[in-house]
Design a protein with these regions (language model features):
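Hydrophobic residues in well-ordered beta-strands that form the structural core
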Residues: 31, 58, 96, 119-121
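A short helix->loop->beta-strand "cap" motif at the edges of active sites that frequently abuts
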Residues: 26, 89-92, 115-117
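Short loop or secondary-structure boundary microenvironments that flank
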Residues: 11, 35, 74, 98-101, ...
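NAD(P)+-binding Rossmann beta1-loop-alpha1 motif at the extreme N-terminus of oxidoreductases
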Residues: 1-63, 87, 128
Length: 152
């Protein structure tokens, strides 16, 4: 894979998440945003991408990510997923981070895909700028795998 993480949609959430990941040493990211060439919205998208050191790529190039994080709108979640998931290969993970209903997520999960392509419905609980310590249990679990390293 060319990128470890690709964002589809580079608005406020993806921008802040990319800053947080970069601060932890995770830098192999790229992003696509449908409005990146828009005369009004595009300037901010390009400024944020430059600041976060996240290259902006084509929608087609998003299929070159190990993890593809969809962070656009619940209204377009299925159509975006339908355009990307069928192109993915074994070992890639499509993560839907939109605030979509369970019915929409089930529809995305039913999109035909190659064997070994994974789908994850995930939620966003704040951003890097509003981060806080979260304690889920009394003792820290050993880390299973460092996703910053490409072992595919």
């Amino acid at each position: 894979m060319k990128y470890q993480l690709v964002f589809i949609g580079f608005g406020e959430a993806a921008y802040n998440i990319s800053l947080g990941l970069a601060s932890e040493g995770f830098t192999n990211m790229a992003a696509y945003d449908a409005f990146m060439d828009d005369p009004q919205r595009g300037k901010l998208i390009h400024q944020r991408a430059e600041e976060a050191k996240v290259p902006l790529i084509s929608l087609e190039a998003c299929a070159e990510g190990r993890f593809i994080a969809s962070m656009n709108s619940a209204k377009v979640a299925v159509s975006v997923a339908s355009g990307i998931i069928p192109q993915l290969k074994s070992g890639q993970v499509y993560v839907d981070l939109n605030s979509a209903s369970p019915t929409v997520e089930e529809e995305i999960d039913k999109i035909p895909r190659a064997e070994g392509v994974r789908f994850c419905d995930a939620g966003v609980m704040g951003t890097y700028l509003t981060r806080s310590e979260i304690f889920l249990q009394q003792q820290q679990m050993p880390r299973q795998k460092d996703i910053r390293k490409d072992d595919s």
